[in-house]
Amino acid sequence: MTFLDMLRAAERQNGSMLCVGLDPEPTRFPAHYSGDVSKIYDFCAAIVDATADLVMAFKPQIAYFAAHRAEPQLERLIAHMRRAAPHVPVILDAKRGDIGSTAEQYAKEAFERYGADAVTLSPFMGFDSLQPYLRYHGKGAFLLCRTSNPGGDDLQSQRLASVEGTPLLYEHIARLAQGPWNLNGQLGLVVGATYPAELERVRALAPTLPLLIPGVGAQGGDCAATVRAAWRAAPGTSGEALDTLAPIIVNSSRAILYASSGADFAQAARREALATRDLLQAARQPA
């Protein structure tokens, strides 16, 4: 089963477009974990168990593990996901970008060491920096396109005078990913919920690519506006027609992980995940 197959299956089984981002910060853990970095696995596994039937994907952010020398806990966590939620794909949020043998090692890390189903990548160094990942047929790769941070404008919203049509950089990335770079149907795009107009533009340029959309929850992105922009559904479009479009994966991290600082953190995370999932699904319904 390919990554895209897994996404669609999880979407159907859990009725969800929600991705829970796993960005563990020990200083924000409940008091009974006392900020203990050795409890990263325990904290994240509890979140996984509480939300596995509500999500389309899980997205662990590798830096939150590596900063605490907790890569073995990440390996253990992904192994736990395979047992507890085998139907839910795992997106390793690594944002790697390098060439040659270094990119080969990063790809090996993502898909062999951690066993992720997909990975986030920077396309800045061009197609040859992506090829080592695309050799893992059936795996997915999400390219940074229009990111949720304000500083993304510094590069992503600049016009490319030497490219036909003088597109903005993020538009050029979307076209390349939709076209010549997507040799095996493995690519997707990362587009922030904080920029709904640009999100709609990316969907128009890349209608068959899955979109990973961070920025709802703590970053302020609006669930309903995000779904409307990503689906680009005209009034009267049927639900069946919407189901044929490429998946969107809407990520929320901190709002779910830290919904409570008490012993009930996992139950609170479930409540927040359920509420977010239902908001997303309600926004999906055609007018």
UniProtKB/Swiss-Prot annotation:
Its BP terms in the Gene Ontology are: 'de novo' pyrimidine nucleobase biosynthetic process; 'de novo' UMP biosynthetic process
Q: What class of enzyme is it?
A: lyase
Entry annotation: catalytic residues: K95 (proton donor)
Entry keyword set = Decarboxylase, Lyase, Pyrimidine biosynthesis
Q: Does this UniProt record's set of keywords contain Lyase? A: yes
Q: What NCBIfam families does the record tag this protein with?
A: pyrF_sub2
Q: Which HAMAP family did the record assign?
A: OMPdecase_type2
Q: Which family does it belong to?
A: Belongs to the OMP decarboxylase family. Type 2 subfamily.
Name of the protein in its database record: Orotidine 5'-phosphate decarboxylase
Q: What is the lineage of its organism?
A: Bacteria, Pseudomonadati, Pseudomonadota, Betaproteobacteria, Burkholderiales
